[in-house]
Design a protein with these regions (language model features):
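Residues immediately C-terminal
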Residues: 109, 124, 140
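Clamp-loader machinery-focused feature within the broader ASCE/P-loop NTPase space
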Residues: 1-113
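A short beta-strand-to-loop transition that corresponds to the Sensor-1 phosphate-sensing loop
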Residues: 105-106, 133-138
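Conserved catalytic/switch belt of AAA+ P-loop NTPases
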Residues: 91, 116-133
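Charged, glycine-rich active-site and insertion segments that engage polyanionic ligands
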Residues: 1-45, 49-51, 127-129, 137-241, ...
Length: 309
């Protein structure tokens, strides 16, 4: 099920119908907007069937692998060997479908070597091959890669569309409205909350933990960091919730209380100056970027953040 993005879907349908296709597409926008779902639908438009997880000989799906080692969970980078698989895929003629397709999810996780290998593929496109890249931040890609792709920007979806898309008779209107509001224009999050409402409780626990953290001394903060740094994907999820909490404080400080997501932020109105809040938000974003890079020490990056908040 795809919620929203009608303009993008109509554009892709028209491109397929008119056979006016680019050799490469870049689907860019914040996480949980539905970029992967739209990409899968696009592949179905092109080849007339669902994109299986690498069971279709004409479709190759590449994404970062998750590694757990000595109790530490990390998302690996997309390396040169995976880029060469893509290069090989794009050099072949379709086996039974109309196009050879390679989809790279979280393309910003490519190493420099992998990026350069992919660039060579883009510089020598073949007529029956299409590459789809998905990223939450196009600035993580080489500018030369971005310039060779048809850029498709994904924007947050209207609350009314999300509410209609996830309408569930088993939910009371208050819970449904809460899910829609907390999704903040991201249908993927709304679906996650709908399928597992314990995530709403987890989110509240994370915000409560943040409130406690703000009252801790630096040694206790570092102990907390040592714990969460062992699971980098989870740590990034925590940072995302923190980001919206501090964003709420910024909204309160600028006279926009109706846009606040977390009611827990209300008592903290005025606790930080606006310049300080902007700096904290920038630091959280920077820390999240550091955590997305598996070569950077996650614990060190989080400790630096503790000094800022």
């Amino acid at each position: 099920m795809i919620i929203g993005h009608k303009r993008i879907l109509d554009f892709l349908k028209k491109s397929v119908a008119n056979k006016h296709l680019a050799h490469a597409y870049l689907f860019a926008g914040p996480s949980h907007l539905g970029k992967r779902r739209v990409a899968t639908e696009f592949i179905k438009m092109l080849n007339g069937q669902e994109a299986g997880e690498n069971i279709d000989p004409d479709v190759l799906i590449v994404e970062p692998e998750i590694l757990e080692k000595e109790g530490v969970i990390k998302e690996l980078e997309i390396g040169i060997s995976q880029a060469r698989r893509i290069q090989h895929q794009m050099s072949l003629f379709p086996y039974q479908a109309s196009y050879k397709i390679a989809l790279i999810d979280r393309a910003g996780r490519m190493t420099r070597e992998a990026s350069n290998c992919l660039l060579k593929t883009l510089e020598e496109p073949t007529g029956k091959a299409i590459l789809i890249l998905i990223t939450s931040n196009s600035r993580l890609l080489l500018p030369t890669i971005v310039s060779r792709c048809q850029l498709i920007n994904f924007l947050p979806v209207k609350e009314s569309e999300i509410k209609k898309g996830i309408s569930d008779k088993s939910l009371d209107d208050k819970t449904l409205s809460q899910i829609v509001r907390l999704s903040n224009g991201r249908p993927g999050l709304a679906i996650q909350y709908l399928n597992d409402q314990s995530l709403l409780e987890d989110q509240n626990k994370i915000i409560s933990q943040l409130e406690k953290l703000l009252r801790m001394d630096i040694n206790d903060r570092y102990q907390y960091v040592e714990k969460i740094a062992k699971d980098v994907p989870k740590a990034r999820q925590i940072l995302n919730y923190w980001l919206f909490w501090f964003r709420d404080l910024l909204l309160l400080g600028t006279g926009c209380p109706d846009l606040v997501l977390y009611s827990q932020a209300l008592p903290y109105k005025g606790s930080y100056s606006l310049p300080k809040l902007k700096k904290i938000i920038q630091t959280i974003k920077k820390t999240d970027w550091y955590l997305s890079n598996s070569s950077i020490n996650a614990r060190l990056a989080l400790e630096v953040l503790m000094l800022e908040i």
